[in-house]
């Protein structure tokens, strides 16, 4: 087993989380650049050249310049093998992002240093809290005018309830951005702008009290010395144990666009971030060093290859080793499958996986049998937990332009809901189809994909639905009574789970009071 252990110990699997426009896609590009995975990083907004960001590869993403789907990239760095999951940054694509966070062992949080903590970051951090995921923080855009760094860290501590330990500290900002002081190494790393795929060789001055610093920085030298005395008294020291518990975050400063500071983060992730962690199942904890293979599906993606109408299920490997041609047991349906063509990814560039280890993400071709949350083992009947469905926040009724295509519409919606792109509800008392999403852009995506993939033209209508809850009751008799009396508010979701569709929050609260034995759940395990 030693070969397996060596491979597992090398892995670092993390996702990047941020508010839209904090620079997440740029960071993703630069992380790949520093890992030599990309020779030329695509800048995100300069689309005229036809140079699209490597991790934004669905048509709609290319049109809009936002990353809609989760891409997976693997590359070596500093003796480790990094699996980076690029999560949708646009605020409307949060549910897919939430689920991706269940497949990683740590997260890199990117904050726009001019703006500080923003609302989408708050929501994403709430999800990482469900599993106490370790967080590394990058204060981006230091080559612009930024807020006071101590103020930024105070805000992270106050709002996100996580202690901050600065690892690097900015010297100046905007046009006067001179570089950073690396606190742990006692080094000044001078800023030299590198754009696109140019990485400037770092110019380093050893020691905060080195006279060389005065020659290079002039009055800034004493300024940073004074500031570091203040910082030492006002901030936390880095503590790896607190970091691994999700209680403390190491903080780095830099500019992703200027190719500066990204390698400092990667060094920290390699040194401190956890290697693949054990996973909870309904039976027991599964550890990465177990001999037998196991993994779970956290995302399903249609049409990764425009030439084929295929669907790929993304699997996080949890234990053992994937080998080409191996037999896996699909626990939910109780069937064995031979897998010879699993994929590894370089953001849309796919290649056949020869082998994969815990922490790795592989793609399985899915012909409609796999769902989000499905567990695969080498025979053991266990189910990994903690891959949630979140109650949608917005609803529309969907209607066909051509009524004869009802069958294709339903098929398309169910497949898109299994993929996690949207949720679909079929009211018990009517033939309506209701689509639920976490943001407006998801509705657009669904109509676009129904047209291009299923040849179905659909339109939306408003509907008075405020929220949805999955309903459960241990007492069959009481559940039957509830179904009978509330049928006008009940629907089945894409997986045939009973759901309460509330026209208003007042209506929901009244029903919850009236039926105390019925559980109204905001999330549902897949």
Swiss-Prot record:
Places the protein is found: Cytoplasm
Ligand binding (GTP): 18-25, 86-90, 140-143
Alphabetized UniProt keyword annotations: Cytoplasm, GTP-binding, Nucleotide-binding, Protein biosynthesis
Keyword Protein biosynthesis: yes
InterPro entries: EF-G-like_DII, EFG_III/V, G_TR_CS, P-loop_NTPase, PrfC, RF3_C, RF3_dom_3_sf, RF3_GTP-bd
Disulfide pattern: none
Pfam families: EF-G_D2 (PF22042), GTP_EFTU (PF00009), RF3_C (PF16658)
One Gene Ontology cellular component annotation held by this UniProt entry: cytosol
Location (main, coarse): cytoplasm
Single GO MF descriptor: guanosine tetraphosphate binding
Recorded family membership: Belongs to the TRAFAC class translation factor GTPase superfamily. Classic translation factor GTPase family. PrfC subfamily.
PANTHER family: PEPTIDE CHAIN RELEASE FACTOR RF3
Role of this protein: Increases the formation of ribosomal termination complexes and stimulates activities of RF-1 and RF-2. It binds guanine nucleotides and has strong preference for UGA stop codons. It may interact directly with the ribosome. The stimulation of RF-1 and RF-2 is significantly reduced by GTP and GDP, but not by GMP.
Name of the protein: Peptide chain release factor 3
Organism: Shewanella frigidimarina (strain NCIMB 400)
Gene, per the UniProt record: prfC
């Amino acid at each position: 087993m030693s070969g397996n252990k060596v491979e597992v110990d090398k892995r670092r699997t993390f996702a990047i989380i941020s508010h839209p426009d904090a620079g997440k896609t740029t960071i993703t590009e630069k992380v790949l650049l520093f890992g030599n995975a990309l020779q030329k990083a695509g800048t995100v907004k300069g689309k005229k050249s036809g140079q699209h960001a490597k991790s934004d590869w669905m048509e709609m993403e290319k049109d809009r310049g936002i990353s809609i789907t989760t891409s997976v990239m693997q590359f070596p760095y500093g003796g480790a093998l990094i699996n980076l999951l690029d999560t949708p940054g646009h605020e409307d694509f949060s549910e897919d992002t939430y689920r991706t966070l269940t497949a990683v062992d740590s997260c890199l949080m990117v904050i726009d240093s001019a703006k500080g903590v923003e609302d989408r970051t708050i929501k994403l951090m709430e999800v990482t809290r469900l599993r106490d995921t370790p967080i590394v923080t990058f204060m981006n855009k230091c080559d612009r005018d930024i807020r006071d760094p101590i103020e930024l860290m105070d805000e992270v501590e106050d709002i996100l309830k996580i202690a901050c330990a600065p690892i690097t500290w900015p010297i100046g900002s905007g046009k006067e951005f001179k570089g950073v002081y690396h606190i742990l190494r006692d080094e000044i790393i001078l800023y030299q702008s590198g754009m696109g795929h140019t990485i400037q060789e770092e110019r380093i001055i050893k020691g905060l009290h080195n006279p060389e610093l005065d020659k290079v920085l002039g009055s800034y030298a004493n300024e940073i010395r004074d500031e570091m005395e203040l910082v030492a008294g006002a901030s936390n020291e880095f503590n790896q144990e607190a970091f691994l518990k999700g209680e403390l975050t190491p903080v780095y400063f830099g500019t992703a666009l200027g190719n500066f500071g990204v390698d400092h983060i990667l060094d920290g992730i390699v040194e401190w971030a956890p290697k693949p962690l054990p996973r909870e199942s309904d039976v027991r904890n599964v550890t990465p060093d177990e001999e037998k293979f196991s993994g779970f599906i956290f995302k399903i993606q249609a049409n990764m290859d425009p030439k084929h109408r295929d669907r790929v299920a993304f699997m996080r490997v949890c234990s053992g080793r994937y080998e080409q041609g191996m037999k896996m047991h699909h626990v939910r349906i109780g069937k064995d499958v031979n897998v010879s063509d699993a994929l590894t990814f370089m953001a849309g560039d796919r290649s056949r996986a020869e082998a994969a280890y815990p922490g790795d993400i592989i793609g399985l071709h899915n012909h409609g049998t796999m769902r989000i949350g499905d567990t695969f083992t080498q025979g053991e009947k266990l189910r990994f937990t903690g891959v949630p469905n979140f109650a949608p926040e917005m609803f529309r009724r969907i209607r066909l332009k051509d009524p004869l295509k009802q069958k294709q519409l339903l098929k398309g919606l169910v497949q898109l809901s299994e993929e996690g792109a949207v949720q679909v509800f079929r009211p018990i008392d009517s033939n309506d189809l209701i689509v639920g999403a976490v943001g407006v852009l998801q509705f657009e995506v669904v109509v676009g994909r129904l047209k291009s993939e299923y040849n179905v033209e659909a339109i939306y209508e408003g509907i008075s639905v405020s929220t949805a809850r999955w309903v459960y009751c241990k007492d069959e008799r009481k559940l039957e009574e509830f179904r009978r009396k509330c049928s006008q508010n009940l629907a089945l979701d894409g997986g045939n789970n009973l759901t309460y569709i509330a026209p208003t929050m007042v209506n929901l609260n009244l029903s919850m009071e009236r039926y105390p034995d019925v559980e109204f759940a905001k999330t549902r395990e897949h």
